[in-house]
C-alpha cells in the first residue's frame, strides 16, 4: 500500500499536516465544502501560472470569517516579490478578485531547496525540457539531495524517455526510502516536463529521517482535542458497561419470581374450587 499511495496523504496527521485550513458551512452558499475546494484549486493554479522560475514548493491556505491567508514557500522569494513589491501586489490583487475577501500574502523562503521533493522534481523536468539526458538529470539531482543531507531518495520518470517510440518508466534509488513506515518523514513531489515528444512525468521521494517520539508528542499536544469515547472520564471506553460486565443479579430475580407466580395461581384456583 505504501508503494502506491501518496506519501503525504498516507501520513496525514502523523508526520504531515493539511495544506488548507478552514471550516465549511453547508447552509451558506459560497461557503460549502465544494466551493472552498474549487477556490483552493484556482488559487494554486494562479500561483503556478507564470511563476515557474520562482521555485514554489507549496502553497498553504487558511481561511477566517472575512480574510484569506496565503503562505507561499519559494526558493526564490525575490521573483515572487518583484521590484519594490510590484509582483506581490499584483498577486494579492488577483487573489482578492478571485476570493472576494481581504488576502494576507506571506512569502516564505525555502532554506534548503535540494531537500524539497517538489523543487527537485521541477528541476529535473526543466532539464528534460532543455533536452538533457534523463539519466544524467536524475542522477545529478540525487547526488545534490544526498549532499544536502537526505538519508534516501528515489526518482522515477515515465513517458517517451529519450524520444523512444514506446513509453516506459525508469527509476533510480539511493539510500533508504521506507514508504511503509508511518513515522518516516518522506517528502513527495510531482511535476510534468513538456517536451517535443510529449509529456514526461517526474516523481521524487526524499527520506529525511524518522520523526522522534518527542516530536510526535509535541504534534499531539498542539492538535485540538476531539471528543471520543475513549477520552471520556471514568473507565476506558466511556461509562457504558459492556454486556458481559453487567451484574447477574439484575436479571436473576425476574427469572426466579416468574415461575413462583405461575405456581401460586393454580393453587389459589384449587382452593376456591
UniProtKB/Swiss-Prot annotation:
**Segments of skewed composition (Low complexity):** 218-227, 249-273
Q: Does the keyword GTP-binding apply?
A: no
State the name under which the record lists this protein.
Small ribosomal subunit protein uS3
- What Pfam families does the annotation carry? KH_2, Ribosomal_S3_C
SUPFAM superfamilies cross-referenced by the UniProt entry: Prokaryotic type KH domain (KH-domain type II), Ribosomal protein S3 C-terminal domain
Quote the gene name from the UniProt entry: rpsC
Organism from which the protein derives: Paenarthrobacter aurescens (strain TC1)
SMART domains, per database record: KH
User: Which GO BP annotation is one of this protein's?
Assistant: translation
Amino acid at each position: 500500500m505504501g508503494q502506491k499511495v501518496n506519501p503525504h496523504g498516507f501520513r496525514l496527521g502523523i508526520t504531515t499536516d493539511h495544506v488548507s485550513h478552514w471550516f465549511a458551512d453547508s447552509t451558506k452558499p459560497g461557503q460549502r465544502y465544494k466551493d472552498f475546494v474549487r477556490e483552493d484549486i484556482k488559487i494554486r493554479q494562479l500561483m503556478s501560472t507564470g511563476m515557474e522560475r520562482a521555485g514554489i514548493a507549496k502553497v498553504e491556505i487558511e481561511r477566517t470569517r472575512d480574510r484569506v491567508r496565503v503562505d507561499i514557500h519559494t526558493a526564490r522569494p525575490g521573483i515572487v516579490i518583484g521590484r519594490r513589491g510590484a509582483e506581490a501586489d499584483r498577486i494579492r490583487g488577483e487573489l482578492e478578485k478571485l476570493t472576494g475577501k481581504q488576502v494576507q500574502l506571506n512569502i516564505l523562503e525555502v532554506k534548503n531547496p535540494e531537500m524539497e521533493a517538489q523543487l527537485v522534481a521541477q528541476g529535473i523536468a526543466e532539464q528534460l525540457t532543455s533536452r538533457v539526458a534523463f539519466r544524467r538529470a536524475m542522477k545529478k539531482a540525487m547526488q545534490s539531495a544526498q549532499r544536502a543531507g537526505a538519508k534516501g531518495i528515489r526518482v522515477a520518470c515515465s513517458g517517451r524517455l529519450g524520444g523512444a517510440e514506446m513509453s516506459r518508466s525508469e527509476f533510480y534509488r539511493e539510500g533508504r526510502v521506507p514508504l511503509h513506515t508511518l513515522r518516516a518523514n518522506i517528502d513527495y513531489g510531482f511535476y510534468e516536463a513538456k517536451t517535443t515528444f510529449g509529456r514526461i512525468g517526474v516523481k521524487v521521494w526524499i527520506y529525511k529521517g524518522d520523526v522522534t517520539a518527542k516530536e510526535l508528542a509535541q504534534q499531539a499536544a498542539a492538535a485540538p482535542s476531539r471528543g471520543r469515547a475513549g477520552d471520556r472520564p471514568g473507565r476506558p471506553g466511556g461509562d457504558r458497561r459492556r454486556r458481559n460486565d453487567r451484574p447477574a443479579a439484575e436479571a436473576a430475580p425476574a427469572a426466579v419470581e416468574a415461575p413462583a407466580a405461575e405456581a401460586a395461581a393454580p393453587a389459589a384456583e384449587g382452593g376456591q374450587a
